């Protein structure tokens, strides 16, 4: 019997907790498919060191692990307090002062790093600090000072983020730091580049042009975290189509749109991304308690399982692996939860694009192969022989319980497919074509233990090997 694979991929964030090569190796063995470099933290040298460590271990283990560079973006923050933190009392007044020295904050006022904030707010706006833990109501704006009344108080420490309820902050999509980090990401050779806080599709177009100008070949991920980005379905689709993948970044997004709206928006984003043939990652606090505990809460287990059932390509861990005490255990638990959720039959039925026109021959072949696989009894696997990974992506848009094997001679392509739901990347290089190449692939998969004699498989390939966009054939073969 063909062995069962976990279909949902796991993205883990690198950090101090993963700097040990033994821990990193065990994380890969436990199920990590993509490692994230969070450019909001750490130095250029640290990121390069961690990326090299991942690459060397993955090469030794003969597995294809993708690297994801995550740009900080225009995160709007307060500056620093003289005493590092202050206590804000409800009904007291507090000033956000764009002219104040960045280190001279007090319990009465604090500086802000985004100097145009006074122009972006108006009376009665609600400003959310530290992910909404502190809430301020704007009562007046005078020049560069924003006068507020404290609605929800508490301890406020240095450099906490500022959001506006309902969105409306107009900071530019790429900062000077982001541009420096893009250069670092090129030196590292990341496969994916995540763009933070896009509000419209044009923001992604701008980010892509900038990255390409610097020489980046990375695929672009849109991090959905602004209220404007989910204002209506038209804007959602515009952002999805302008990117190669999206990340449902539930932290800032939940703060801006309100926690009560988050679950519905998550489901909408995942559904639309899959319908538009894009990859989708669900992120933020998925197993937050495992930063300090060896076991997750039941609510966290349900959250991960729900993201799987929604159809996420990947679920992501942040501080749980970057700075947590139990990075390996977290990966193991998340992997088990994903596999448990994938047993549910609800995710094995798909109507993907059944009523839509196909855009090209590759998509037509991929869709026909997957529908045949889901409706012909006895199919055990789908094999895509691919140059760019596009056919593998298309087949992975139709949910099924069947493994998809992406075979390519291009390491970059194999790393990209590491993020696709249900796809297992395998290196394959041959001068053969047609049925001869297909038979060689089958022999390789049997040798690797992925297939057994008697299995029925579907193979997609092109008549001409080695050229992008030439997939035009689907075969059903018996091993």
UniProtKB/Swiss-Prot annotation:
Binding site for ATP: 38-41, 77, 160
Enzyme class: transferase
SUPFAM superfamilies per record: Phosphoenolpyruvate/pyruvate domain, PK beta-barrel domain-like, PK C-terminal domain-like
Protein name: Pyruvate kinase
Keywords: Allosteric enzyme, ATP-binding, Glycolysis, Kinase, Magnesium, Metal-binding, Nucleotide-binding, Potassium, Pyruvate, Transferase
Gene3D superfamilies linked: Phosphoenolpyruvate-binding domains (3.20.20.60), PK beta-barrel domain-like (2.40.33.10), Pyruvate kinase, C-terminal domain (3.40.1380.20)
Quaternary structure and partners: Homotetramer.
Similarity annotation: Belongs to the pyruvate kinase family.
Regulation: Allosterically activated by AMP and by several sugar phosphates. Belongs to type II PK.
NCBIfam families documented for this protein: PRK05826.1, pyruv_kin
Cofactor entry: Mg(2+); K(+)
TM region positions: none
Pathway per the UniProt entry: Carbohydrate degradation; glycolysis; pyruvate from D-glyceraldehyde 3-phosphate: step 5/5
Pfam families the UniProt entry points to: PK, PK_C
């Amino acid at each position: 019997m063909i062995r069962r694979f976990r279909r949902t991929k796991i993205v883990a964030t690198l950090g101090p907790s993963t700097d040990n090569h033994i821990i990193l190796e065990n994380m890969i063995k436990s199920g990590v498919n993509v490692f994230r470099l969070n450019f909001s933290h750490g130095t250029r040298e640290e990121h390069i060191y961690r990326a090299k460590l991942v690459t060397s271990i993955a090469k030794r283990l003969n597995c294809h692990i993708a690297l994801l560079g995550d740009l900080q973006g225009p995160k709007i923050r307060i500056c620093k307090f003289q005493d590092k933190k202050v206590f804000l009392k409800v009904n007291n007044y507090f000033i956000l002062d764009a002219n104040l020295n960045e280190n001279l904050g007090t319990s009465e006022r604090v500086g802000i790093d985004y100097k145009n904030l006074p122009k972006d707010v108006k009376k009665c706006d609600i400003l959310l600090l530290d992910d909404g833990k502190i809430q301020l109501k704007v009562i007046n704006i005078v020049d560069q000072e924003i006068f507020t009344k404290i609605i929800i108080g508490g301890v406020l420490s240095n450099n906490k983020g500022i959001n506006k309820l309902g969105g409306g902050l107009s900071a530019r999509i790429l900062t000077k730091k982001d541009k420096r980090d893009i250069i670092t990401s090129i030196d590292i050779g990341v496969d994916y580049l995540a763009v933070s806080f896009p509000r419209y599709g044009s923001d992604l177009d701008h980010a892509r042009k900038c990255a390409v100008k610097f020489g980046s070949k990375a695929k672009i991920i849109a991090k959905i975290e602004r209220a404007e980005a989910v204002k209506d379905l038209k804007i959602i689709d515009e952002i999805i189509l302008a990117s190669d993948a999206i990340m449902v970044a539930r932290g800032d997004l939940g703060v801006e749109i309100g926690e009560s709206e988050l679950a519905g928006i998550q489901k909408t984003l995942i559904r639309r991304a899959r319908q538009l043939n894009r990859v989708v990652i669900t992120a933020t606090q998925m197993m937050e308690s495992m930063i300090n505990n060896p076991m997750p809460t039941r609510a966290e287990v349900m959250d991960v399982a729900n993201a799987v059932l929604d159809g996420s390509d990947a679920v992501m861990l942040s501080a749980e692996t970057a700075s947590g005490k139990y990075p390996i255990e977290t990966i193991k638990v998340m992997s088990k939860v994903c596999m448990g959720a994938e047993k549910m039959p609800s995710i094995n039925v798909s109507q993907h694009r059944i009523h839509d026109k196909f855009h090209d021959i590759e998509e037509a072949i991929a869709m026909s192969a997957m529908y045949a696989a889901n409706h012909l009894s006895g199919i055990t696997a789908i094999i895509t022989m691919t140059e760019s990974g596009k056919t593998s992506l298309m087949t992975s848009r139709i949910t099924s319980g069947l493994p998809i094997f992406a075979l390519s001679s291009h390491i970059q392509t194999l790393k990209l497919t590491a993020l696709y739901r249900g796809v297992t990347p395998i290196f394959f290089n041959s001068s053969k074509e047609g049925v001869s190449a297909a038979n060689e692939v089958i022999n390789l998969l049997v040798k690797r233990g992925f297939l057994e004699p008697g299995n029925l498989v579907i193979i997609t390939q092109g008549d001409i090997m080695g050229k992008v966009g030439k997939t035009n054939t689907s075969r059903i073969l018996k091993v």
